[in-house]
């Protein structure tokens, strides 16, 4: 089977990761200690994508938990699913990274990284046919951002032909933890552009908006936000965990979603989003799911796709849905909103189906879109970065850990390049492409 090894780094990564494992354990009929007491064979059929079967009908997640301070780990261990994880797979330091990317990437993190890689190697050796890695982390902190990206590049070196998917929590415009977030995020994006195959961008502000506007929660907790993220992660990974009619794996997703290697930053959405008490008052239909899924208010990253165009997108439907209805609806969405899809990639909406819905729902859909409007997110971080970097504010925290200013300049220009690449493809049209092609043709002959 095609296994996935999961890494969670830093406080944010560990909390999202814990929520994810809680969600999928429930879907696969596992209790808090990993013992199977489900009812359906379908739950067991592809269990080993994420779980390793131990003795006594107990399943253990293929998860590696990493942090530079013991606090979050203790919280996970004390939580409802703390006994699920293999004790050797908790790898933590004592010092903390203090929201400093350089500490996570170069000093504190670098000391711990070999220990983590040993655990990753052991997990990979326990797989029949490893398809890739997924990592949950935030880009604004020290450990998740700095050490997370260090791990990604080390794993890339050792497993160059395996997929690398990241679920990255991007700093949001209004909700900020620390003042150096723009630095940490820019340095991280600089790494992700080169080393990740697919990055699912999530941001806290969009999650807050969804909680307040759609779920009618007055003061959402991080628990509520993480619950949303875990719903999306569970949706994106459905096809990998359950037999479906249209199965996909991380690589197929990437092939369908990434038209140019650098442009692999996706927006995600989930439907149906209904407040906790209101589930029983409405029936969900495929048209409703489709409409809600493509609604900008449902996107979990604070950029509005109406300001850009979709290069590609993918929808994963779960539950008892008719294939034909889904196809019709998706075609319908494309025809109605054709201006939001680039016309030089025909059929750029891909659909996958899985017959098993998430717990408590009849059907659901998860949306993954590669939209040029994600540049807003990078622009926003870039502007904040520039404002601080121009004055060299807070730089001594980074140079003190041995970083060079050059690295900041490089990261900044790499992010600006990324923004302009998105812009270039947003404006490209079919006819333009043909003319360029004709001009290039003779050159090949000359070579």
Curated annotation (Swiss-Prot):
Main localization of the protein described in the UniProt heading: cytoplasm
CDD domains: beta_tubulin
SMART domains, A to Z: Tubulin, Tubulin_C
Record: residues binding Mg(2+): 69
InterPro entries to which the protein is assigned, alphabetical: Beta-tubulin_BS, Beta_tubulin, Tub_FtsZ_C, Tubulin, Tubulin/FtsZ-like_C, Tubulin/FtsZ_2-layer-sand-dom, Tubulin/FtsZ_GTPase_sf, Tubulin_C
Gene3D superfamilies: Helix hairpin bin (1.10.287.600), Tubulin/FtsZ, C-terminal domain (3.30.1330.20), Tubulin/FtsZ, GTPase domain (3.40.50.1440)
Cofactor: Mg(2+)
Subcellular location field: Cytoplasm, Cytoskeleton
GO MF terms held by the record: GTP binding; GTPase activity; metal ion binding; structural constituent of cytoskeleton
A GO-annotated cellular component: cytoplasm
Binding-site positions, GTP: 11, 69, 138, 142-144, 204, 226
UniProtKB keywords: Cytoplasm, Cytoskeleton, GTP-binding, Magnesium, Metal-binding, Microtubule, Nucleotide-binding
Spans annotated as Disordered: 424-447
Pfam families xrefs: Tubulin, Tubulin_C
Assembly with partners or alone: Dimer of alpha and beta chains. A typical microtubule is a hollow water-filled tube with an outer diameter of 25 nm and an inner diameter of 15 nM. Alpha-beta heterodimers associate head-to-tail to form protofilaments running lengthwise along the microtubule wall with the beta-tubulin subunit facing the microtubule plus end conferring a structural polarity. Microtubules usually have 13 protofilaments but different protofilament numbers can be found in some organisms and specialized cells.
Reported function: Tubulin is the major constituent of microtubules, a cylinder consisting of laterally associated linear protofilaments composed of alpha- and beta-tubulin heterodimers. Microtubules grow by the addition of GTP-tubulin dimers to the microtubule end, where a stabilizing cap forms. Below the cap, tubulin dimers are in GDP-bound state, owing to GTPase activity of alpha-tubulin.
Similarity annotation: Belongs to the tubulin family.
Protein name, entry field: Tubulin beta chain
Species name: Venturia inaequalis (Apple scab fungus)
